[in-house]
Structures are given as C-alpha cells and as structure tokens.
Amino acid sequence: MKMIRRRVGIAWFLWAGVIASLMGGCASSKQIHTQADDHYRLAQSYLSNESNLLAEQEIRKALTLRPDDARYLECLALIHQIQVYQPQGTLNLTRLQLAEEAYRAALRQADAPPSVLVNYSTVLLLRERPDEAIVMAQRALQVPGYDQPARAYTNIGIAYLKKGALTQAAEHFRKALDYQANLPEAHHNLGIAYTGLGRRAEAIREFHEAIRFRPSYVDAHLGLGKVLLEEGRKDEARAAFERVIALAPGSDMAAGVREQLKSLVP
C-alpha cells in the first residue's frame, strides 16, 4: 500500500509539473503575441505617416516573434509596395519582387484575409501579369463577408484594360462604382476604357469625376487633357496639361506634356 501511495504521489507531482509548465508556456506565448501585435500596430502607424523605414523596422520585429502571421506579412508587403513607385515615374523592381514574396508568404497561411488577394493582384498588374491578377481578385470576391469589392472589381477592370478587352474593363469599373461611387481610380480607368471605345463625352465625364474626388490625380488630368485635345477643345486641354506640370513637374509625364503644349501655342 505504501508503494502504491508513493507511485500515485509521484504521478501527481509529475502531472502538476506538466500543468505548471503548460501554464507558463501559455503565459509566455500570450506575452509574445502581445509584443508582436504592439510592433505591428506601431508599424501601421508609421506606414500611415509615410515613415516607411521605421514601419519596416517595426514589422520585422513583429515577424521575428511571429514569423507566420498573415497580417504581419501583408503589412511588410505593403511597405515594399508603397516604395515601388519612384519619383521619376519608374518602378523599383527590387521592392516589387520583395512585395510579391511577402504576399505569397501571407497566402500560405490559413488565416490570410481577402485583402491579401487584392493587394497581391495589384502587384501582379504592375508585373504585367493580368490573368493572374484577375484570378486573385476574383478569389477575394468569393470570400464571404469581404467588404471592399470595389477595389477587387477595379483591379479586374485594370487587368482587362491591359489585355485590350475594353468592354469587359468598362463593365468591371462600373461594378466597382456601384459599390463605391467616390472611388477615383475606378472613374479614371473607366475614362481610359471609354476613350479607347471612342466614347469621348463619357470619358471626359469620368476623368472629371476622378479629379473631383482626388484633385491631385495627375493621371486623370493627363487623360482629360488628351481626350479634350481629341475633341478639339484646345484651351481646356491646355489647362489640363498645365495642371499635370504643376502637380508633377519633374516627371516623365510632365516632360511629354510640355512637348504637347508647344503645339497648342496660339
């Protein structure tokens, strides 16, 4: 009987030790999760203030603690993606590749949110892979409860623009605007589609709408100027082109517009 009691006592002691270890492990895991989320939130704050270097430092700290968190990987991808666009109008291909790698890593996680699919589709568009971009954006639209369909439809429309399928492109931009009527990208790209389809009056309207919702939208001013010029409305075209130069004086767009303005001199 003493032997039995001793063995039971030993078993209880070992089990108590296991419980204590598990509780300590859970507490440690929760603490790590909290620390990682703190870095993640700080990275988001830096990103919203365009402090990209500090944002990247913080999200890498979060990923050191939790390397498989889809939210952190998406944040890292966005930091790279924001830095793809260079002042002279060219793309930083290294950042573009890093953004794609981070999005692909995020998509390998079971809990990746649908926003990863749409943001990744943007990168695929920049890499001139429209068919893959369409697939990604369509996958996002199939996720129950996805609350930003306008962005997905806009990216699908841009993909069709790149493929030269203007009617399909216009259809998807209109769908985007059904969900979010004040989305400047959808208005601008619908203007491009209408221009290609020869529907210039509608194109002018859409470029004006894009500019109304985002007055600093350089591409929309450029598109407006071009279609106004096609319509023979030279004074209005000149005003649109001058706005391009004012908004982006050192860009390739501005250089091209300056040449066009020479032909508009009275």
PLM region descriptions:
Residues 75-78, 119, 155, 189, ...:
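Canonical tetratricopeptide repeat
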Residues 31, 65, 109-110, 143-145, ...:
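Structural marker of alpha-solenoid helical repeat scaffolds
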Residues 222, 226-266:
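Terminal, low-structured helical/coil segments at or just beyond the last alpha-helical repeat
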